[in-house]
Regions:
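N-terminal metal-binding scaffold of metallo-dependent hydrolase/deaminase domains
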Residues: 4-70
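Conserved beta-strand scaffold positions in the cores of enzyme catalytic domains, especially
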Residues: 18, 24, 73-77, 190, ...
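Divalent metal-coordination and catalytic microenvironments
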Residues: 22, 52, 57, 80, ...
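C-terminal cap of metal-dependent C-N hydrolases
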Residues: 36-41, 368-370, 390-424
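Metal-associated gating/positioning segment near the N- to mid-region
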Residues: 78-141
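Alpha-helical segments flanking ligand/cofactor-binding loops in enzyme cores
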Residues: 85, 147, 245, 249, ...
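Metal-coordinating catalytic core of metallo-dependent amide/deamination hydrolases
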Residues: 126-141, 147, 155-268
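Active-site-adjacent C-terminal substructures of enzyme catalytic domains
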Residues: 257, 267-382, 396-400, 409, ...
């Protein structure tokens, strides 16, 4: 290796190695490529005292340590730690300019999230800051957050725009996300969310802003190939169901599948709009009744719940238990953002799901892995420890049982993170 560039290229090559002495390996013999739903969400097969072979950055094979083959291939000793799939966080806003702890204090003093937004805080506050932040500054701060969530165990993440709310600022955000895609081994999907809030210059003219998104922003985003999805915040005080459907329809014409922020604050019609236009997922879902469950049961749309938003804003939690028992597929995500969920730690999301939404630990892990992968369209290559999927997994400390992960909500149980066959 004659030069630094040669050394760097060598280190970036996906490796071939064994993980040995695994206390418990959560492996997917079936090769799941569809979300688990209903009763199947509690099924999480494993083998004990195992080895796992990673070959050229992908999962190759596994078996019992009692049958470990003689080999010259290098091995990493898990020392009885468990191996589980890396988290798949399908809903984040981790590209942003500045934190909003002043609004945190305002809520302590009695203001609601909606009242803060009406006073120019919330999403508008973030948008005004972002417009005055350079692309490089945005990239540098977002890269720090990306490295942080990788160390928490996240191996695939969806990142939304939506703090620009004008053409140049939305493009700036999406270009940052594009740069992040090649910065680490974490798999990233980008989501165009100009319909996050109506900016001040369009106050009282939501229809005009929607037309601006459709006619001016969307063609440019597609021309530059900056987005994998299109999104709308369909809720009370934000975008109407009618305008949500207009944006989803326009996105479909450009080949962008929809995702929706729906029913966080009220029964908004967002779920029905998502089902009507074949959205990949509808997210939040704090306000869900029989009509929404029925609509989702007759669709291919995944329900993504975001319990840390309910925790941080003191909102009701999504009725996850009711939704799973009805037969729906659920995914869990962080909603990592500066205003309503300033954390990207997926293990805490599992704890909230179990404590506040009565999800079983096995259901929570599936919701945060294979179902999360499905909710951002990466399930063919990520989300489970299956042959020929990319080797994204975690090695934990030795555990007594799976329930200890959500139970010990303040502990960092992850010893090693492996993404695409590379130790992080």
């Amino acid at each position: 290796l004659s030069t630094f560039a040669d050394l760097l290229q060598f280190r970036m090559q996906p490796r071939t190695f064994y993980i040995t002495n695994i206390g418990r390996l959560y492996c997917d013999e079936e090769g799941l490529t569809a979300p688990l739903k209903g009763a199947s969400m509690s099924q999480l097969p494993f083998i004990e005292s195992a080895w796992l072979l990673i070959e050229n950055g992908k999962f190759h094979s596994w078996g019992s340590m009692s049958l470990f083959p003689e080999t010259s291939i290098s091995a990493h000793d898990a020392t009885n730690g468990w191996v589980i799939p890396a988290w798949c966080d399908s809903h984040t806003h981790l590209v942003y300019a500045g934190s909003r702890e002043n609004e945190f204090v305002a809520r302590i003093n009695g203001l609601t999230y909606e009242e803060i937004a009406q006073q120019g805080g919330g999403i508008i506050n973030s948008a005004l800051r972002l417009r005055n932040t350079t692309e490089d500054q945005l990239y540098d701060s977002a890269l720090i957050r990306l490295h942080e969530i990788i160390q928490f165990g996240t191996g695939a993440v969806e990142i939304k725009s939506g703090y620009g709310l004008d053409l140049e600022s939305e493009l700036k955000m999406l270009r940052v996300i594009r740069r992040l895609k090649s910065a680490t081994n974490c798999e990233i999907r980008s989501n165009f969310l100009a319909a996050h809030a109506v900016p001040p210059e369009y106050k009282g003219r939501q229809d005009d802003y929607v037309n601006h998104i459709i006619n001016d922003m969307l063609p440019k985003v597609v021309e530059e190939g900056l987005a994998d999805f299109i999104d709308v915040f369909c809720d009370r005080g934000f975008f109407t169901q009618g305008n949500t459907e207009k944006i989803l329809s326009a996105g479909m014409k450009y080949g962008l599948r929809g995702k929706i922020h729906a029913n966080e604050l009220d029964y908004s019609g967002g779920v029905q709009a998502g089902v009507k236009y074949g959205a990949l997922s509808v997210d939040h879902l704090e306000c869900v009744g029989e009509a929404e469950i029925t609509a989702l049961l007759n669709s291919q749309t995944i329900s993504t719940v975001l319990p840390s938003t309910s925790f941080f804003l003191k909102l009701p939690y999504a009725p996850a238990r009711k939704m799973i028992d009805a037969g729906l597929p659920l995914s869990l995500a962080t909603d990592y953002n500066p205003g309503s969920s300033p954390s990207g730690r997926m293990s805490f999301i599992l704890s909230l799901a179990c404590i506040h939404m009565n999800m079983l630990p096995e259901e929570a892990v599936n919701a945060a892995t294979i179902n999360g992968a499905c909710a951002m369209g990466v399930e063919m290559e990520f989300g489970s420890i299956a042959k020929n999927k990319f080797a994204n997994c975690l090695i934990t400390q030795p555990l007594e049982n799976l329930a200890y992960i959500p139970y010990s909500f303040g502990s960092d149980l992850v010893k090693k993170v492996i993404l695409k066959g590379e130790m992080q």
